[in-house]
């Protein structure tokens, strides 16, 4: 897709949506010299959505992220893009309807290359009441979804449920209900939202940490930033600043020296990843627990199983899973499996934090059960809470609150009509997968894999291999991915470190038993020419990544959060100049 807005000095053969080294240098210069309408803090899905919403209203936008795009909550979800079936028990009908509308919109229009339909089985284990109770809930869920791109529910006897999921324990099953929902690679989706914002003119820069809020009297007029790579500092001026930092909301709020309208509480959610052959099933599963639900979701050649829900008051950047977390997940899922899972079956584990609203203060906040928008100081807007699926609505609400500080008339949100990069032409390319594969010497399944990660941007990815066909070969110890995907992550997707690539642009860190260690050097050598790494840089990146994996694995054997956090914190930061926490003075 061609870019209609070319930044000054940005024409290096790549569009502005390509978040590579050249764009990064230009972005730093622009941040320190230009006046912006909106400065967004936070490169998660909500912050990226805010940047896209504001840019497509015609505003001049800057987005700064202290670490990597989606490095927090937005890469560590259950990978569900759903309405929230469990919220119906809480009678949150309006919220579920809103989320289901967003699901339909992304599935059909905004991001069909990233958001995918998936059949789920709800195993029934209670003899008389469970089927009508769950069926009524799923029926309402289907009806609230409105326009249908997925089939309605279907009921099964025990024999029928076992045909769908032969791996279930026969003695604990009386039947099942199949329904459809959708899944997404959250990190890739978030990165694509940010790149789409850049396509429409937003200045997007990672490793750019906010360390101060600039003030003029009682009004916030911008932010002080620090480069997390080299410690350089700059001031970024904007008519309004949007705090979309999730679990870091209170930390940024503290920089304003104003009392916040709400506080955010971090809740830890842990997932485990096991090979597909450990659970024999043709469908995903949703299991009831005492407090919530547990998802068993197919993920390529694996299953993702989770989640937990416990308070977390330690390191926000690196939440750690414990042995107790993993035991809880295994115990829950093993209650319905014919062949129990063990710790030895696990290929990957990840922990993320949900930003939950802990309370709110007055009527100036726009509040809902799901998210809240507030104006804690003139020129400062904060948004928190919510769920991944409704990121677009959250972003529109935040920018609606921000426009009062912009000295010009501002158009309403139009992101309902703005497809993400890669969506345009996706369905046609799926039909042409065999032809594309023949031209590139790739198997059609490999082309479809690329299409489901890049959509119509596949042409940009493959173009990188035109001068070096060896990039089309698989990564030796992670053959599910091509070398060119690593190179493209560095050249166009904002990746600056090995961790960014192995954990977020690709999911090697959770999809292989070695968690990326065995392919770290190979991938580092592929991206070194793109990022200008020396041999010493390669050695440092590999060592840092291996230390991260070792710390995570050791922490996952600990009995409690405190001991797990201490071990995880022992690994060095990939971004050497990151400040954690930001000093308030």
UniProtKB/Swiss-Prot annotation:
InterPro entries: DAO_C (IPR031656), DAO_C_sf (IPR038299), FAD-dep_OxRdtase (IPR006076), FAD/NAD-bd_sf (IPR036188), G3P_DH_FAD-dep (IPR000447). It catalyses: a quinone + sn-glycerol 3-phosphate = dihydroxyacetone phosphate + a quinol. It comes from the Bacteria. Its main location: cytoplasm. GO terms for molecular function: glycerol-3-phosphate dehydrogenase (quinone) activity. Its cofactor is FAD. Keywords: Cytoplasm, FAD, Flavoprotein, Glycerol metabolism, Oxidoreductase. This is Glycerol-3-phosphate dehydrogenase 2.
């Amino acid at each position: 897709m061609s870019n209609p807005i070319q930044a000054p000095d940005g024409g290096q053969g790549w569009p502005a949506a390509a978040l590579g080294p050249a764009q990064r240098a230009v972005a730093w210069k622009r941040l320190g010299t230009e006046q912006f309408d909106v400065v967004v803090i936070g490169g998660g899905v909500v912050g990226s959505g805010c940047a896209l919403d504001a840019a497509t209203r015609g505003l001049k936008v800057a987005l700064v992220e202290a670490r990597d795009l989606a490095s927090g909550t937005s890469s560590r979800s259950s990978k569900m893009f759903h309405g929230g079936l469990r919220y119906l028990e809480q009678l949150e009908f309006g919220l579920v309807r809103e989320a289901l509308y967003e699901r339909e919109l992304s599935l059909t229009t905004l991001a069909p290359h990233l958001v995918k339909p998936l059949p789920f089985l709800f195993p029934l284990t209670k003899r008389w009441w469970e089927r009508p109770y769950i069926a009524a809930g799923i029926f309402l869920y289907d009806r609230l979804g409105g326009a249908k791109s997925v089939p309605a529910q279907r009921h099964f006897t025990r024999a029928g449920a076992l045909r769908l999921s032969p791996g279930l324990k026969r003695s604990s099953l009386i039947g099942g209900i199949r329904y459809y929902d959708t899944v997404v690679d959250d990190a890739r989706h978030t990165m694509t939202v940010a790149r789409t914002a850049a396509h429409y003119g937003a200045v997007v820069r990672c490793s750019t940490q906010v360390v101060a809020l600039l003030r003029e009297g009682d009004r916030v007029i911008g932010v002080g930033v620090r480069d997390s790579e080299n410690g350089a500092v700059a001031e970024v001026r904007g008519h309004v600043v949007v705090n979309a930092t999730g679990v870091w909301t209170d930390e940024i709020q503290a920089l304003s020296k104003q009392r916040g309208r709400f506080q955010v509480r971090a809740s830890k959610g842990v997932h485990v990843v096991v090979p597909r052959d450990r659970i024999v099933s043709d469908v995903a599963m949703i299991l009831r627990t005492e407090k919530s639900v547990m998802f068993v979701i197919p993920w390529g050649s694996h299953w993702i199983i989770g989640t937990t829900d416990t308070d977390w008051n330690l390191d926000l950047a690196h939440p750690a899973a414990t042995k107790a977390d993993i035991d809880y997940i295994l115990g829950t899922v093993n209650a319905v499996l014919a062949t129990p899972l063990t710790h030895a079956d696990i290929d990957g584990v990840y922990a993320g934090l949900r930003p939950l609203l802990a309370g709110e203060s007055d009527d100036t906040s726009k509040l809902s059960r799901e998210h809240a928008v507030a104006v804690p100081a003139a020129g400062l807007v904060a948004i928190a809470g919510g769920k991944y699926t409704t990121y677009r609505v959250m972003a529109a609400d935040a920018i609606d609150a921000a426009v009062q500080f912009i000295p010009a008339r501002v158009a309403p949100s139009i992101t309902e009509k703005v497809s993400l990069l890669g969506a345009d032409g996706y369905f046609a390319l799926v039909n042409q997968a065999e032809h594309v594969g023949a031209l590139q010497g790739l198997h059609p399944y490999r082309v479809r894999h690329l299409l489901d990660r890049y959509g119509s941007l596949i042409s940009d990815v493959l173009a990188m291999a035109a001068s070096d066909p060896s990039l089309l070969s698989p990564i030796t110890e992670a053959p599910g991915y091509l070398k060119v995907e690593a190179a493209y992550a560095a050249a166009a997707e904002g990746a600056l470190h090995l961790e960014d690539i192995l954990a977020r642009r690709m999911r090697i860190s959770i999809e292989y038993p070695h968690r990326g260690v065995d392919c770290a050097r190979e991938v580092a050598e592929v991206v070194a020419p793109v990022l200008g790494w020396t041999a010493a840089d390669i050695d440092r990146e590999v060592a840092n990544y291996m230390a991260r994996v070792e710390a995570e694995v050791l922490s996952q054997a600990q009995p409690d959060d405190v001991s797990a956090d201490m071990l995880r914190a022992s690994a060095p930061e990939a971004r050497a100049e990151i400040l954690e926490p930001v000093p308030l003075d």
